[in-house]
Amino acid sequence: MNHKFIALLLVVLCCALAVHQVSAEVPSHCTLSLATGTCKGYFPRFGYNIEMGKCVEFIYGGCDGNANNFRNLEECQQSCSV
């Protein structure tokens, strides 16, 4: 049982270090959530998805977004990709 606990602890630590390393390399504005905003517009935009490690398309409503909001894929990749 002691060996299982140690193995589990090592897995958790490795995962935590991997997430920390990726987060440290990505600019802080790219770690923000993909905010659709509160308005009802329909604007295709791109934002960095920290869990997927890449830029993805989402729909922006037109207001109350954040800095993780780019007009095209290239803009997002230039700003956020590591």
UniProtKB/Swiss-Prot annotation:
SMART domains: KU
Any single GO BP term: venom-mediated suppression of fibrinolysis in another organism
An annotated GO cellular component: extracellular space
UniProt-annotated site: Reactive bond for trypsin, residues: K40, G41
Location relative to the cell: Secreted
GO molecular function per UniProt: serine-type endopeptidase inhibitor activity; toxin activity
Keyword set, alphabetical order: Disulfide bond, Hemostasis impairing toxin, Protease inhibitor, Secreted, Serine protease inhibitor, Signal, Toxin
Primary location: secreted
Coiled coil regions in record: none
Stored Pfam families: Kunitz_BPTI
Tissue-specific expression: Expressed by the venom gland.
Disulfide bonding pattern of the chain: C30-C80, C39-C63, C55-C76
Signal peptide interval: 1-24
InterPro entries, per database record: Kunitz_BPTI, Kunitz_BPTI_sf, Prtase_inh_Kunz-CS, TFPI/VKTCI-like
Domain BPTI/Kunitz inhibitor: 30-80
Role, per record: Serine protease inhibitor that inhibits plasmin (IC(50)=43.53 nM, Ki=3.6 nM), thereby acting as an antifibrinolytic agent. May act in a cooperative manner with the serine protease Bi-VSP (AC B5U2W0) to promote the spread of bee venom under anti-bleeding conditions.
Other facts noted in the record for this chain: Negative results: does not inhibit factor Xa, thrombin, and tissue plasminogen activator (t-PA).
Family from the record: Belongs to the venom Kunitz-type family.
Protein name, UniProt field: Kunitz-type serine protease inhibitor Bi-KTI
Species the sequence originates in: Bombus ignitus (Bumblebee)
